[in-house]
Amino acid sequence: LSSEVIKTIDNRRALYVAALLHDVAKGRDEDHSVVGARIATELGPRFGLTSSETETAAWLIEQHLTMSLFAQSRDLNDPKTIRDFAAIVQSRERLKLLLVLTVCDIAAVGPGTWTGWKGQLLRTLYYEVEPLLGGGHTELTRSQRLQCAQSALRERLADWSDAEFDQFVGRHYPAYWIRTDLDVIAEHAELMRSAEQQKSVIVTHISTDAFRGVTQLTLLAPNHPWLLAMVAGACTGAGANIVDAQISTTRDGMALDTIHIQREFDHAEDEERRARKIASSIERMLLGEADVVDVIKAKVLSTARLSAFSVQPQVIIDNTLSDALTVIEINALDRPGLLYEVTREISNLNLDIASAHIATFGEKAVDVFYVTDLTGKKIASSSREALIRERLTRVLVETQEPELEVS
């Protein structure tokens, strides 16, 4: 996308200066994006930029991490995410410039840093925001969006009987239709129909995507408060990194989770073998045949390799980033087992996770969770927020050392 977009940018002078200077202030105590923008404001005229070009270059430098953070750490199915990003960018031209700079910045870090998954996230954000900036986008009401999603699915599942389709629709809450991509809903529908026909209680489906660099694991199982923690533990035990998780619960008490795992192997057969191992571990845990701590303990102890690094643990709770959900952001030293520890504690705090977005920046993990309380509402109490922050911070501090707490 970026290679096509750059051809449509009439004036690239500000982009080139931003690419040159975007990290010039790294290593300073102050935010390097802010300092870099000030430096660009001073140097722009000396580089021959006009005042308008200088302003654009400074803006690009100040915002050069924003698109990556939104794409990797926010729920792109949440309209509030798209509105917030559009408010920052404000014009299509700036959106184009920021996309190109973001792609260059990620790809220049080093081999393996750029992945198809990151590219897909950036493309999704770009295409969602572009109509909003063009003035041609009219936001639908919640009920209209729900009806559009169900109508589109009915066309997709043309071979289904009305009774089958109505049964599937009736199993899901309204939020599912609004937050979930149509392709994913169609996959879920086929999976749930297959489970119904086979009388299966626990069903998994695996698909690999070499272009995006991910393997998708879809899990249908009886809802369990620790289910995502079990999934995280199984992935840790198999040496797999979760990059995204969408969690849904049906009206009849089933969990329907779509997990994206970072691709490691060149051949699909190897990816599928690892995914089957993960699925088997999850099923054994749900059936009480395996303990999650035993599954991940050997992996955690054998990879205690990050003690030389230090990242200040941080827990941020924000009720402004989503209209319906509370957003919890975790910043900590990345290590095997971290996601398991955090998701387990979130479950212990009686919070429901609607989606999880997992990113790593060097040795730093940035895990973002969209959550509600058990009634499906945002976390509204300041004392409740304080307790959540305290408990999660304690987990992060304790897990700086490679040791598992068994409970």
Which functions belong to the PLM regions below?
Residues 2-135:
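Divalent metal-dependent catalytic cores for phosphoryl transfer on phosphate-bearing substrates
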Residues 80, 84-407:
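Regulatory modules associated with amino-acid/nitrogen control
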